[in-house]
A protein has these predicted regions:
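Cytosolic regulatory regions built on CNB/CRP/Popeye-like sensor folds
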Residues: 1-161
Length: 161
């Protein structure tokens, strides 16, 4: 015989993986569940094979990505310098939300990868539909970019050995 109330006492493990990933990205910090859902509706899920480019250096910059599964390497294709090796939960390309400059580095999947794309057009749609929410995201984005600039300045200020 099956119990009537089993589902009431189970924890919900079926949380949307996109929402779960977004809530851990500093750009979407301090958003309510409803606000996060509005952002998630504007995202685009993409899959990449191992060694497939997410974007190439000098390509038009359209938006940022959050890694759901897999890994991505950010590198300079001219000098072959690796800037970052990223995996699930990491995000990259966020500067493209603000400016229209070409990509300054390339991104390639180091293994099969599933990414969430959030593009400049999505941010503009968010700002138009929900100005307060759009401003929260812009403020968080500014904070993230400021932190990255500060860290870069500290790295450059270190004496070379």
């Amino acid at each position: 015989m099956k119990a009537i109330y089993t589902n009431y006492f189970k924890k919900k493990d079926n949380i949307d993986p996109v929402l779960k990933a977004l809530e851990n990205v500093p750009i979407f910090e301090h958003l309510t569940e409803k606000e996060l859902s509005e952002v998630a509706r504007l995202t685009h899920e993409r899959t990449y094979k191992k060694d497939e480019h997410v974007f190439k250096k000098q390509a038009p910059a359209e938006g940022m990505y959050v890694i759901l599964d897999g890994g991505v390497e950010i590198f300079d294709s001219d000098s072959e310098t690796i800037f970052a090796s990223l995996d699930s939960g990491d995000f990259f390309g966020e500067l493209a939300l603000l400016d229209e400059e070409p990509r300054s580095a390339a991104a390639i999947a180091t293994m099969p990868a599933r990414l969430i794309g959030f593009f400049r057009t999505d941010l503009l749609t968010l700002i138009k539909r929900y100005p307060e929410l759009g401003n929260k995201v812009l403020l968080n984005l500014s904070r993230v970019l400021g932190e990255r600039l500060r860290k870069t300045n500290q790295e450059l200020a270190r004496p070379t050995q």
